[in-house]
């Protein structure tokens, strides 16, 4: 991640206390810099800056420790629906159900899809209890025209 956080610092600046240097490390004259007094002064300044920056950052992240992250509830063998991000006309938003094969704290691997899927893009597939109808029943009747059928809906 290279986006500055709430303190306006990049990850490099958090670790090293300054923007990244533009130095050619393949230069043969680099060996002179390793023992130079300016490098020693820079390293001491770096240590001071790190002490100043790390305290406020530690306090900012300490607030998050009070609220532990709860991993997703999905386990191997569960049935899940996978979100379809680009739906076409009359296409359902969720596809599946798929069986969960592997899990990590943030992602799932499901049977039939090659890529890992983030847990936020998945929902549990609930099945109705055995012996109960999930919706209305439909009855098919022939009509006099061989190219047509009549569908009638019955009570659930």
UniProtKB/Swiss-Prot annotation:
Co-factor binding comment: Magnesium ions are required for integrase activity. Binds at least 1, maybe 2 magnesium ions.
UniProt cross-references to InterPro entries, sorted A to Z: MLVIN_C (IPR040643)
GO terms under biological process: DNA integration; establishment of integrated proviral latency; symbiont entry into host cell; viral genome integration into host DNA
Signal peptide boundaries: none
EC number, UniProt record: 2.7.7.-, 3.1.-.-
Cofactors (names): Mg(2+)
Molecular function via GO: endonuclease activity; metal ion binding; nucleotidyltransferase activity
Domain of life: Viruses
Modifications after synthesis and translation: Specific enzymatic cleavages by the viral protease yield mature proteins. The protease is released by autocatalytic cleavage. The polyprotein is cleaved during and after budding, this process is termed maturation.
Keyword list, A-Z: DNA integration, Endonuclease, Hydrolase, Magnesium, Metal-binding, Nuclease, Nucleotidyltransferase, Transferase, Viral genome integration, Virus entry into host cell
Function statement: Integrase catalyzes viral DNA integration into the host chromosome, by performing a series of DNA cutting and joining reactions. This enzyme activity takes place after virion entry into a cell and reverse transcription of the RNA genome in dsDNA. The first step in the integration process is 3' processing. This step requires a complex comprising the viral genome, matrix protein and integrase. This complex is called the pre-integration complex (PIC). The integrase protein removes 2 nucleotides from each 3' end of the viral DNA, leaving recessed CA OH's at the 3' ends.
Note: This protein is translated as a gag-pol fusion protein by episodic readthrough of the gag protein termination codon.
Name recorded for this polypeptide: Gag-Pol polyprotein
Organism expressing this protein natively: Mink cell focus-forming murine leukemia virus (isolate CI-3)
Gene that specifies this protein: gag-pol
């Amino acid at each position: 991640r290279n986006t500055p956080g709430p303190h306006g610092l990049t990850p490099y600046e958090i670790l090293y206390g300054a923007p990244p240097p533009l130095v050619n490390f393949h230069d043969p004259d680099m060996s002179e810099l390793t023992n130079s007094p300016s490098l020693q002064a820079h390293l001491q300044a770096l240590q001071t800056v790190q002490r100043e920056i790390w305290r406020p950052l530690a306090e900012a992240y300490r607030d998050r420790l009070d609220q532990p992250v709860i991993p997703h509830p999905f386990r191997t063998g569960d049935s899940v629906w996978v979100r379809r991000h680009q739906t076409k006309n009359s296409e359902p938003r969720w596809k599946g159900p798929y069986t969960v094969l592997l899990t990590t704290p943030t992602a799932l691997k499901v049977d039939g899809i090659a890529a890992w899927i983030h847990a936020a893009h998945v929902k549990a597939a609930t099945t109705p209890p055995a012996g109960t109808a999930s919706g209305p029943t439909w009855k098919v009747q022939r009509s006099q025209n061989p190219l047509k059928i009549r569908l009638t809906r019955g009570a659930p």
